[in-house]
């Protein structure tokens, strides 16, 4: 049985989550679909990467993770499959993968091109890619390999003087705890 995780900025009030799950189950009726979160702030790939980073390694190897945050397919932004740390990440080439780890590099990145010219939503493309992988398909058949993904580099910590450090709040949890850039390596900050 396949395990597919979903993480999005859809929210929980509309029908997008049901649509995504319906599409997945239509392709892979025995899939185990796990919701990581659908409450990511709209278009916030930094928050999405933080949540993904804290959760993905707890899943079995070869789990397929669909991250639909800021994932509009356009000429400027490709949809990709990244084989990273023995997991598959299906998302947009928007800097998300670069935020998962500085130490671990992706084994392979594929720009999804099997549906060029298809104006379907990104979730339809993600589902087709996930189904291909789950059925044992080689990710090379989904498109073309890309060597360099977009990198997100705006989270640098800056020291202005001996007593001032500037950083960024990455995530605010349900208890009001703030995670900021200098905490990023600390797993249990609150």
Describe the predicted segments one by one.
Residues 11-13, 74, 97, 174-177:
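Short, acidic Gly/Pro/Ser/Thr-rich loop/turn segments
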Residues 27, 43-48, 60-69, 73-125:
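Active-site histidine-anchored catalytic micro-motif
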Residues 1-75:
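N-terminal glycine-/serine-/threonine-rich phosphate-binding loop
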Residues 180, 184-190:
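Single conserved hydrophobic/aromatic residue that forms the stacking wall/gate
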Residues 117-179:
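Anionic-ligand-binding alpha/beta catalytic cores of soluble enzymes and soluble regulatory domains
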Residues 7, 68, 91, 171, ...:
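Alpha-helical architecture
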């Amino acid at each position: 049985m396949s395990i597919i995780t979903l993480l999005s900025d859809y929210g929980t009030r509309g029908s997008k989550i049901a649509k995504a799950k319906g599409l997945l189950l239509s392709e892979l009726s025995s899939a185990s679909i796990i919701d990581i979160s659908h409450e990511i702030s709209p278009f916030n790939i930094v928050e999405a990467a933080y949540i993904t980073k804290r959760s993905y390694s707890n899943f079995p190897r070869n789990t397929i993770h669909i991250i639909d945050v800021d994932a509009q397919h356009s000429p400027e932004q490709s949809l990709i499959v990244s084989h990273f740390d023995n997991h598959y990440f299906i998302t947009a080439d928007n800097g998300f993968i670069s935020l998962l780890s500085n130490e671990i590099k992706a084994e392979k990145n594929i720009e999804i091109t099997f549906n060029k010219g298809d104006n379907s939503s990104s979730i339809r493309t993600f589902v087709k890619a996930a189904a291909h992988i789950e059925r044992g398909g080689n990710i090379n058949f989904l498109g073309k390999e890309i060597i360099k993904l977009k990198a997100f580099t705006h989270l640098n910590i800056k020291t202005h003087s001996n007593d001032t450090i500037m950083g960024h709040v990455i995530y605010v949890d349900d208890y009001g705890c703030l995670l900021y850039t200098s905490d990023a390596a600390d797993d249990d900050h609150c």
